[in-house]
Amino acid sequence: MRAFILTGGLLATVTAGTGAMAATVITLDQSVNGQPGRPQVMYLDTDKLRMSSPDNDMIYRGDQSKVWIVRPQDKAYIELTPEGMAQMKAQMDQMQAQMQQRMASMPPEQRKQMEAMMAGRGMGPNAPAKPQITYTKAGEPKKVGDYSCTPFTVTMTAGPASDFCIASLSDLGLTRDDLKSFVGFGQFMSQMGGTGTQRSPMASLDFDSMKQQIGFDGFPVETAFKAPDGRHNVDTVLKSIQHEAPPAGTFDIPAGFTRQDMGAGMGGPAMGHGPRPPS
């Protein structure tokens, strides 16, 4: 399964099955490896989140402690629960331990390269459950589309750097509460810490840490993620933010879809890697 990078990638206040209330709907344009941009739409509710791309959808239900990865073309979905994720993490930890044993017999230089590659992917025995994120100002304020933002280089523990242009939440008409489900999704996925699921700084969004470093609560209007090997580059640009009711059933599995196991080979969306949070 491919990781959600989220845009990442970004992202309703609706009460399922009852009267519609205003939601936060964030629309992004994401380009992978220089290809034409594709739309990514995020719907945010207090404890619900949906990230949609042309190929896949990811639905986070904080009220149920579940994530669904939905593939409309297959009429199928994968369900992630804390119990299932703990099982997956144990399996991946075992695989990484076997990899470490094989690496022990490698020539020093080759072993060093492998260790660096795994660390860059947020994997390995020393990978932190919650990566440390550092923001370094990288230029003067500028305009990206209709938004004013300040450039920052964003680095994660033992990982590659991303280029962000960050606007203040107030300038975007957002509050921390609007992004509450986005933060909740990142915390949910942190249960897979050390397995490479949190390669995007946005997947570990911490407003307190961000404000302490850059001086304000912000959100990226432009991100650029480049993998160390140069084979995976993701550029994401914020197009619009609206407060409106999302379509009925936005946070539910479509009727008639079949549940598949994690091993069924379904790819997941990701902003920077499907739907993704900003990288």
Predicted ranges, named:
Residues M1-G8:
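Bacterial N-terminal signal peptides that target proteins for export
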Residues M21-S279:
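Extended soluble regions of mature proteins
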Residues G17-T18:
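N-terminal signal peptide c-region/cleavage motif recognized by signal peptidases
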